[in-house]
Amino acid sequence: MKQTPTPHIGAQYGEIAETVIMAGDPLRAKMMAEKYLDNPVQFNNVRGMLGFTGTHNGKRVSVMGHGMGIPSIGIYTYELYNFYGVKNIIRVGSCGSISKDLNVGDLVIAMGACTNSNYAMQYELPGTYAPIADFDLCRRAAEAAEKFGYNYKVGNVFSSDTFYTENAHNDKWMNMGVLAVEMEAPALYMNAARSGNKALVICTVSDNILTGEATTAEQRQNSFTHMMDVAFSLL
C-alpha cells in the first residue's frame, strides 16, 4: 500500500512525475514551474515547500523545493523515491567555488560528493561510502552544457553540515581537487543508491570563496537558469 500523503508532502500517489527537478528555495521551484512547465498543477504546499507537476516538451515532469541542508533534502527525496515512485531526481542549486577555474555563473556538475555529514551512519556500513551521481545523467548533463555553450566543470563537491563554521578547511578540500561547496548532494545520492534510483546535482556558482565575488539573493532566485536549461534537457 502506498503511504501517501506523507508527513511532509501532501500529494496523492500519481500526482508526482517519475522525474523531479528540485531546488532548495521553493520560490525557485515556483519560478521553474512558471518558466518551463506547460499546464503546471500544484501538488504540495506543506510547510511552504511548493511542488508542481506539468509537462515540458510533451514529457511529464515535476518541480519541487527541498529546503536547506542534508536533513531537509534527505527527508523529501526519501519520501519521493520510496512512497511516490519517483525514479530520477535532479537538484539544481547554488554553490561556492573553491576552484581557481570556476567563476560566478559557471556550472558545477557534481560527479561525487565529499561530506562531513554522518548521514551514511544509518546504513551501518563497515567502511566509508562514496556518494556519486548516476553516470548516464552526469554524462548527458555535460554534453548538454557543452551544446548550450555554458561554462562548466564536472567533479567533486564538498557538502557541509554547517553554513557558518569556525574553520571550513576549504584549502584542504581544494588541494584534493574539490570544485565547490554546497549542502545537499550526499543525502540525495545516498537515497538514490539505497532505493535503486537515479540522481544528479547541477549547481551554479553563486560566490567564489577564493576571490570574494558574490551574488544577491534575488539573483540566485531568478537568474540562475543555465543549470535549469541543462536539467530540463535531460528529460
Give the predicted meaning of each segment.
Residues 168-206:
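A C-terminal functional module that forms or caps the active site or interfaces directly
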Residues 82, 169-170, 194, 202, ...:
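Expand to "…catalyze enediolate/carbanion chemistry for C-C bond making/breaking, isomerization
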Residues 140-148, 191, 230-234:
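Generic non-transmembrane alpha-helical segments
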Residues 127-177:
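Active-site rim beta-loop-alpha module in soluble metabolic enzymes
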Residues 26, 96, 158-162, 187, ...:
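Glycine-rich beta-alpha junction loops
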Residues 116-119, 165-167, 208-212:
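Short acidic/His/Gly/Ser-rich catalytic and metal-binding motifs that mark active-site loops
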Residues 209-235:
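His/Asp/Glu-rich mid-to-C-terminal helical/loop segments that flank catalytic regions of hydrolases
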Residues 1-129, 135-139:
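Metabolite-binding pocket within alpha/beta catalytic cores that recognizes anionic/polar moieties
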